[in-house]
Amino acid sequence: MSEPTKRKLHVAIITSGGAGMFCGACMHDNTWTRAMMKQGAEATLIPTYTPIRVDEQNMTGSQVFLGGINVYLNYRSRLWRRIPPFFKHWLDTPWIINLATKFGVSNDAHELGALTVTLLEGEQGPELKEIEELARFVGNELQPDIVCLSNALLSGTIKTIREHFSGPLFCVLQGDDVFLEELGEPYRGRSLELIRQNVQQLDGVLVHSDYYRDFMSRYLDLPRDHFQKVLLGIDLEGHDGTPTENPDEPFTIGFFARLCKEKGLHNVVQAFEIFHKKYPDSRLSVGGFLGKENEAYFQKTTKRLAARGDSYKYWGSPASLAEKVAFYKSLSVLSVPTVYQEPKGLFVLEAMANGVPVVQPAHGAFPELIEKTEGGLLVPPGDPRALADAWERLYLDREYRLKLARQGYERVRQFYSAELMATESLQFFQTRVDAAGFVKNEPQLTPDP
């Protein structure tokens, strides 16, 4: 008699849209979802607040839960909260939300303090009906084996989801502290207090680096054994750049990330001014999403590059994967010298995947990535001169630059593919589902009479 076929593992990931911008966390969630499906699992990506924007196949459904417009109106108006959900659902339509984001709906942390607190209050706050709708969908309709929140800012939903879903519930941390630290008081303190309370109800917290596990263990006051490190990975399809050395092409330094102060664009500009004085044939290329709240910073930071003439090029925000890959392929080296301590570093993996070495600050997750891939150099954080010196080393020693490029190119494929990420995470999830099922169905022992 043949063994019964084992049911596919079903993982539900609840992600947050980035209000019209390319968001590293939701792009990672999208890649993760698709990779698990390719491995034969069932995976559902559930968008909240706004639709997600990605440069690959979008894996989310058409319904947006906790729609940003309704969440904001619930926060602002008691009358609006009393309106039956049936009459409000049209505002959760993706094209309506996307239209609203074009007219100045902001995701700037300074403006979202009070709203963040109300969401973290969960069923005690004004978003109860929206949270209940999400929880009923997950627990009653979808009925997955695993639920994974994409960030701790969604932790206000945990208690209500628990009322409808009894399986393992996790949360991935992908830079939540960066958002929280930008909130003004009293919102920062209250938000952190609520998150610390909410995450106690989780079965575990997932992170992508040892650094972030140790940091968030202290930050959230959670024991380290409550954390699980899961592999960070990228979909390598379409990343067709290769390690090359063309002496006829100018040495081009690249910056690719959200164009804001915390990503360290000003550090790159200062370092390039130092470097370009010595090597005037060099080039600087800048690309990434520019939000309205960062336009003044961007203009002020790049204004000083006008004197460099054609040595500086602004690519804007590539609208497709092909455009992004074309940007990487034009570079000799990538540097995103973040001010904050980066928990992931997807842009590092993307650059290496296209044969481009990196020079990064020696903090956050970067040392782990550089150590494992040997695809770049580390410099002291916040030191433009050290950054320029590292570029100079690669400029003068093209063979060494090519060696780093080859090592990064090969080891990203060896250690950081989406396939490997899906395989390892599904193995972990399966063990937790099996353990939960064993405990649930284990016969109760009775004491001897």
Predicted regions and their residues:
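Acidic donor-binding loop of glycosyltransferase active sites
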Residues: 326-343, 356
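Nucleotide-activated donor-binding/catalytic signature segment of Leloir-type glycosyltransferases, i.e.
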Residues: 298-322
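Glycosyltransferase donor-sugar binding loop
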Residues: 283-299, 314
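A short, well-ordered alpha-helix in the C-terminal region of glycosyltransferases
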Residues: 386, 393, 400-414, 421-427, ...
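Conserved acidic donor-binding segment of nucleotide-sugar-dependent glycosyltransferases
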Residues: 372-373, 377-384, 393-398
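Conserved donor-binding/catalytic core segment of Leloir-type glycosyltransferases
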Residues: 245-263, 269-272, 285
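A conserved catalytic-core segment of Leloir-type glycosyltransferases
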Residues: 47-133
